[in-house]
């Protein structure tokens, strides 16, 4: 009998949400995603020590300024981990721009180009890389410009429909709407504590975004992210891609039985609305208290882990 992970792969491209190379070898995903928190976790793994040492040594060659060395080494470590992962996945690695730049379009573009250059210098072409940016107005504008220059982007920390619409209209390659963090908010802020998978507010959000994109012929890839249980994952079978943590990949692989496709669109393509303006985007996003809370929290958490990573690097310089 087939297992649920194999069955899911019939309908959806499976991506590993981890920086753990051992997990890549085990589950053989198409792509992989990382973020500052995952890079920080990966940096604690003994087998990665050589990647850290290489990043530190490289940074010392680039500058005599300690602050710049920390920035350079942190960027190089993220790319070094990405390079190791790319040896194991046939597709793309997503590497994230410093979350502290989430409200600065030009700085985000500059950092993205810096990361791309590090990959290119290591022999990796742009078609194997996605640059992750937070789905702020400024992040979306940065992605729009980068896409025009041949740098594909993954817009993350996406919680509101306004964010999803703006990303599609900007022509970004891929979005990562978060499922589990939406569920977390509703459990913490409403009286309802249990949800059937089909009623899970994170599942509903991704399903609505998927349908809207397909209805209007947007080519932006929808990649559901941040799962709390396999019920959420199975309810999104058919989504373009799903990025899944190793623990849930393991649970799927150990669960027997075929699954059914839940997301699909076979209808006609409808006319697209006029592009959302900045003021409309900000107002519509602000009307969703969950999205406001979780976007801000996500940026803060990634920034904290970026700073922890920089401190760890600084101690080695």
Curated annotation (Swiss-Prot):
GO terms for molecular function: transaldolase activity; transketolase or transaldolase activity. Keywords: Cytoplasm, Pentose shunt, Schiff base, Transferase. Optimum temperature is between 15 and 40 degrees Celsius. At temperatures above 50 degrees Celsius, activity is lost rapidly, and at 55 degrees Celsius, the enzyme is totally inactivated. The active site is at 132 (schiff-base intermediate with substrate). It holds the Pfam family TAL_FSA. Pathway: Carbohydrate degradation; pentose phosphate pathway; D-glyceraldehyde 3-phosphate and beta-D-fructose 6-phosphate from D-ribose 5-phosphate and D-xylulose 5-phosphate (non-oxidative stage): step 2/3. Optimum pH is between 8.5 and 9.5. Gene3D superfamilies: Aldolase class I. GO terms for cellular component: cytosol; membrane. It is found in: Cytoplasm. Changing residue 178 to Y: Critical for gain of fructose-6-phosphate aldolase activity. InterPro entries: Aldolase_TIM, TAL/FSA, Transaldolase_1, Transaldolase_AS. One of its GO terms (biological process) is carbohydrate metabolic process. Its EC number is 2.2.1.2. Inhibited by Tris-HCl and phosphate buffer. Also competitively inhibited by sugars with L configuration at C2, such as D-arabinose-5-phosphate and L-glyceraldehyde. It catalyses: D-sedoheptulose 7-phosphate + D-glyceraldehyde 3-phosphate = D-erythrose 4-phosphate + beta-D-fructose 6-phosphate. It comes from the Bacteria. SUPFAM superfamilies: Aldolase (SSF51569). Belongs to the transaldolase family. Type 1 subfamily. NCBIfam families: PRK12346.1, talAB. Homodimer. HAMAP family: Transaldolase_1. Transaldolase is important for the balance of metabolites in the pentose-phosphate pathway. Mutagenesis of Phe-178 to Tyr increases its preference for fructose-6-phosphate over 70-fold. This is Transaldolase B. It comes from Escherichia coli (strain K12). The gene is talB.
């Amino acid at each position: 009998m087939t297992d649920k992970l194999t069955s899911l792969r019939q309908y959806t491209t499976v991506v590993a949400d981890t920086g753990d190379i051992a997990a890549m070898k085990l589950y053989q995903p198409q792509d992989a995603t990382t973020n500052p928190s995952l890079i920080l976790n990966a940096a604690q793994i003994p087998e990665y020590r050589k990647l850290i040492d290489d990043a530190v040594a490289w940074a010392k060659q680039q500058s005599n300024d300690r602050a710049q060395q920390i920035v350079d080494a942190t960027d190089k470590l993220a790319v070094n981990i990405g390079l190791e992962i790319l040896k194991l996945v046939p597709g793309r690695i997503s590497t994230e721009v410093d979350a502290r730049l989430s409200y600065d379009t030009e700085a985000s573009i500059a950092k993205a180009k810096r990361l791309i250059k590090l990959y290119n210098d290591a022999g990796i072409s742009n078609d194997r890389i996605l640059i992750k940016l937070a789905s702020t107005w400024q992040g979306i504008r940065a992605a729009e410009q980068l896409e025009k220059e041949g740098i594909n982007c993954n817009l993350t920390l996406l919680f509101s429909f306004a964010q999803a619409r703006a990303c599609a209209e900007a022509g970004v390659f891929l979005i990562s709407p978060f499922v589990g963090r939406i569920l977390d908010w509703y459990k913490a802020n409403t009286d309802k504590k249990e949800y059937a998978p089909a009623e899970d507010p994170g599942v509903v959000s991704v399903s609505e975004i998927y349908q809207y994109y397909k209805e209007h012929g947007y080519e932006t890839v929808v990649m559901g992210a941040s799962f709390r249980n396999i019920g959420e994952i199975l309810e999104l079978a058919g989504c373009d891609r799903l990025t899944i943590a190793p623990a849930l990949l393991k649970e799927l692989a150990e669960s027997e039985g075929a699954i059914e496709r839940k997301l699909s669109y076979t209808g006609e393509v409808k006319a697209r609305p006029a592009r959302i303006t900045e003021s409309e985007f900000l107002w519509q996003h602000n009307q969703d208290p969950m999205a406001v809370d979780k976007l801000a929290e996500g940026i803060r958490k990634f920034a904290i882990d970026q700073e922890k990573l920089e401190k760890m690097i600084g101690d080695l310089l």
